[in-house]
């Protein structure tokens, strides 16, 4: 990029001066009806947006340039944000003059975490900026959603916990101090998966004083954030970033709350992913997730609130109970649900409307939408205040007090205002006597023009005569060439065109001065009136935000009650015990997508309690779950975790009965894949996640483990799985569901008092296997892998060879090295020490005759067996064993 002094034109000097202030952003520079980009920005943007790259002449050089239409800029900005770029919007802040350079200023900087445009934002997703203040071993975190004004802060120990919180919130952008260690901040940003900005360290200083001044309070004690120096430093930096990028004071951020992990159920990234809460494992889609199933909200804020509850389930019994009370009341009252839905429907997105208006980015349509939403609040309040549940009545009470603002906006703003303020006409007649007078002049002018046009046509005989207007010549009379001989001598020629000539008259000049003055006065007055209305809204920002919060809460409660009523969910009993008792539980998403409908789903019981809890003697603390592939082990375990999560977010659950002793954390280790970007194998990923569980699980945690150790050799895998299970039983003592294909782990029940064996039942009918999907007491003897392979369509010759190899393995044949033989003609494995069971407490070589009998028993169709046939079979088996 050239030096500013070398620029050939004043406009290019203006561009370079502006760009120098925003070196890390792509500068959208307004030129007429386009936003233009030059130099490196043009090269970057043209590639990212796949738009044409052209050039602007600069002496002998060509300046790279590209542009996008002003009216379509939103879509292009959104695409750049998706790719992690910042965009500085430089607008013309005065009308173009005839000779002087138009004044231009950056009106806002749009970054991935600083988006207010409703056409760019997902209406049902929060847009969090994460500001981070770092110290050795500890971090302060502030989450700010500029589009709603929500600000919260807290502190965590260690970067791993910090990243967990950043990913849980789904931050779009990070802010660090320029004084922070670069390697550390880069590692955090990579792990969080968000672009990062480095800001002046001064923005993190004197945080408490700056926050008190912004919030207009003598102390932050009332917000519950005292004693969090790092958290407050991050919050102050987040506010500074918002004010700087949006060129406005963020008055809509009128409160701050504590981001606490003490009263919420913690879910790490692996657990949120494995349970498919917001994105599916396959394809990362929203459809097919728990949130998609639960979201029956009417409003966008309600959808965002529901997602927040799903990310942050509670551990406070009183708060859980209050939500459940509200859901229970609405679940049992179909008429009340419909009334509430109808009352919510006219309520627009109060939070985001308020934010745009307060930050100076709103328009007349935003004012109209806000007026309509506020007018609907009294009716909504009445519906809520008539209910019995405390949460519903409280929400209703918080909707009061905005009637005057609603009436004021409704009386001031036209019913269907134009898209931009420049178009004018967005103020209702009767709101301003001065404006009404100016408008009358302008409208009378239209009639005057029509009358003059008719009069001059009659006087001159020029039937095609037109009175027209443009910004260069003002009003003029247009005459085509064939009629020029009819032009009167008192007309003054102004311009010759291809098709004719343009003239003015003294009468038309006088009219123009009068009308143009009126238009200028009208535009200026409408701008002042709009600003007054915007300030009136800003003055009521705290009340509007309170009402918006109440609307979101009521809508989220309605959504949970709709799902509960339609799907037959029940109210869970949530208490301080350490038991987990789910009777006839169902996986909420799986049952909803079954081709034959929810009735086809086979429910299951999950009964488990922490070791030492009164219920542990009956239920056990660690459930070893075995069974064939595809039998439903993973589904049963996931559904147990989802039932706990639903209960602690205050929702009804898919079960006949459920008792949930409070859980502090849910851990899941279900499936794995390579992490090539970080150089980690499948097994390394599996072991890393397992290590995190063993280090962080407590007695109150729920641990769900599926196929631990399968990524390595059989002996290594069994050894690791056994040791992990022992640790969870002996040391942690938490509620654990442990699915495995290592049938040796069933012997844990002989050695550990709180281990119970469960299996998913199957039925063999001839050479077919029927999966019953039912969890029953006992263990499995086979995994039926070959049968599943057959269902998957493996070639017959491959299946036959697999059966042959399996037969050798089951006969305990070994090769010369003592390993299971995969080919025929090997010697039998000798001695008990060679058997895998010997690793954990004794085993004996297999008896071939007994194996044959067992195989025959497994092949029997009991439903078709007559009593006499059974006796004959028994006699034959007895004889063979003797």
Swiss-Prot record:
Annotated keywords: ATP-binding, DNA damage, DNA repair, DNA-binding, Nucleotide-binding
Top-level taxon in the UniProt lineage: Bacteria
CDD domains given in the database record: ABC_MutS1
Protein name: DNA mismatch repair protein MutS
NCBIfam families the UniProt entry points to: mutS1, PRK05399.1
Function text: This protein is involved in the repair of mismatches in DNA. It is possible that it carries out the mismatch recognition step. This protein has a weak ATPase activity.
Record GO terms (molecular function): ATP binding; ATP-dependent DNA damage sensor activity; damaged DNA binding; mismatched DNA binding
Any one Gene Ontology BP term: mismatch repair
Family membership noted in the UniProt record: Belongs to the DNA mismatch repair MutS family.
Binding site for ATP: 627-634
Any single GO CC term annotated in Swiss-Prot or TrEMBL for this entry: cytosol
HAMAP family, per the entry: MutS (MF_00096)
Family annotation (InterPro entries): DNA_mismatch_repair_MutS, DNA_mismatch_repair_MutS-lik_N, DNA_mismatch_repair_MutS/MSH, DNA_mismatch_repair_MutS_C, DNA_mismatch_repair_MutS_clamp, DNA_mismatch_repair_MutS_core, DNA_mismatch_repair_MutS_N, DNA_mismatch_repair_MutS_sf
Species this protein is from: Anaeromyxobacter dehalogenans (strain 2CP-1 / ATCC BAA-258)
UniProt KW ATP-binding keyword: yes
